[in-house]
Swiss-Prot record:
Sites marked Plays an important role in discriminating NADH against NADPH: E75
BP GO annotations: fatty acid biosynthetic process
Oligomer and partners: Monomer.
Pathway(s) it belongs to: Lipid metabolism; fatty acid biosynthesis
Keyword check for Acetylation: no
Protein name: Enoyl-[acyl-carrier-protein] reductase [NADH]
Keyword Lipid biosynthesis recorded: yes
Top-level EC class as recorded in UniProt: oxidoreductase
HAMAP family: FabV_reductase (MF_01838)
Residues annotated to bind substrate: Y226
Domain of life: Bacteria
InterPro entries on file: Eno_Rdtase_FAD-bd_dom, Enoyl-CoA_Rdtase_cat_dom, FabV-like_NADH_b, Trans-2-enoyl-CoA_reductase
Organism (species): Xylella fastidiosa (strain Temecula1 / ATCC 700964)
Keywords of the record: Fatty acid biosynthesis, Fatty acid metabolism, Lipid biosynthesis, Lipid metabolism, NAD, Oxidoreductase
Length: 401
């Protein structure tokens, strides 16, 4: 079929398999250009491995350190009539490239919140990965979670706490600045958001792996978080999602203590704002990202997901000098350090106050934001012919759970 982008709200409903594959190849080349190191992770599990930061970290571990990787994700394959999800094509492209490079790659498609998935991962570690892993990356961004004990479905919300919040935002369909108001979360919504996006499931994973004795000496685990800046704090860090991220921080300290017996440890890694399917859904964030990208590009500080993942592994968790990673007072690895520089944020605040419909494209990097967003789904690549016939059915070596 011939596939062009179709967008609805903040999602793109079509995907391009060739474009997605080229996106993955581009990230692989970016990592390889930094050189391959041997003093890093050897056997890696990535929970949430098919897009965004999870995919980038899997690429960085495999192609930057030669690691064996097991990726867990929940994606839909394409059919004759309909393309699959971008994550399906990303995972397929990763698997193909890893195997071509002689690297071990295993993928499981299913519900990462389920006990069945944990059991399957443990089984594969024991039967195929030499019995132990030394890095567990937790990178799930999900709107809902089926509780493993009861089967109850909990949903996360992107809402402030206490009072409604109104701020500038972009209507990405009309390319216009609007005032978006979000009503506050209820107590139940806050609790459910913590259950979905907090540290509970991460802890279940690490406990299950520890009990099964599949964690190697000096095992590290890392979960991803975002704090942002005062522009986005009311909706994010001071909102329901912030409560979930605070729970993630508390979980990190518990897991760090738990892994001491192995000489290992746990951290939350706070990452920078990037264009992902997850961030596009957060009110005010696309406008802020369009501004901060403009400022950081002008200062030569811009990074995408793969640059952040490489810096996480190469300059934090696995430093060449063997020293422990620098952490903040909350025990977190900070990779939002460049974004939060005073000069960067001061420039962002000025633009935030000045931006209008008339100057949106001049003052911000909004044109590239839109391009980057469509690129997530395999579009807007100069090296892909989007009028050519393409097969939406891409098969690869994946275990369906």
């Amino acid at each position: 079929m011939i596939i062009h982008p179709k967008t609805r709200g903040f999602i793109c409903t079509t995907t391009h398999p060739v474009g997605c594959e080229y996106n993955v190849l581009e990230q692989i080349q970016s990592t390889r250009a930094r050189g391959v190191r041997s003093n890093g992770p050897k056997k890696v599990v990535v929970i949430g491995a098919s897009s965004g930061y999870g995919l980038a970290t899997r690429i960085s571990a495999a192609f930057g350190f030669g690691a064996d990787t097991l990726g867990v994700f929940f994606e839909k394959p394409g059919t004759e009539k309909k393309p699959g999800t971008a994550g399906w094509y990303n995972a397929a492209a990763f698997d193909k490239s890893a195997k071509n490079a002689g690297l071990y790659s295993r993928s499981i498609n299913g519900d990462a919140f389920s006990d069945e998935m944990r059991a399957k991962v443990i089984e594969i570690i024991k039967s195929e990965m030499g019995g132990h892993v030394d890095l567990v990356v937790y990178s799930l961004a999900s709107p809902l979670r089926k509780m493993p004990s009861t089967g109850e479905i909990k949903r996360s919300v992107l809402k402030p706490i206490g009072v409604a919040h109104t701020s500038n935002a972009i209507d990405t369909n009309k390319d216009q600045i609007i005032q978006a108001t979000v009503e506050p979360a209820t107590e139940q919504e806050i609790a459910d958001t913590v259950a979905v996006m907090g540290g509970q499931d991460w802890e279940l994973w690490i406990n299950a792996l520890a009990q099964a004795d599949v964690l190697a000496p000096q095992t590290r685990t890392v979960a991803f978080s975002y704090i942002g800046t005062e522009i986005t704090w009311p909706i994010y860090w001071h909102g329901a999602l912030g409560k979930a991220k605070a729970d993630l921080d508390a979980t990190s300290r518990r897991l760090d203590a738990r892994l001491q017996f192995l000489g290992g440890g746990a951290n939350v890694a706070v990452l920078k704002s990037v264009v992902t399917q997850a961030s596009a859904a957060i009110p005010a964030l696309p406008l802020y990202i369009a501004i901060v990208f403009k400022v950081m590009k002008e200062k030569g500080l811009h990074e995408g997901t793969i640059e952040q993942a490489d810096r996480l592994l190469r300059e934090r968790l696995y430093r060449e000098d063997g020293q422990p990673a620098a952490i903040d007072e909350e025990h977190r690895l900070r990779l939002d350090d460049w974004e939060l520089r005073e000069d960067v944020q001061a420039a962002c605040k000025v633009i935030w106050e000045q931006v209008t419909n008339e100057n949106l494209f001049q003052l911000t990097d909004y044109a590239n934001y839109k391009r980057d967003f469509l690129k997530l789904f395999g579009f807007e690549r100069a090296d892909v012919d989007y009028d050519a016939d393409v097969n939406p059915e891409v098969a690869f070596d994946v275990i369906e759970l």
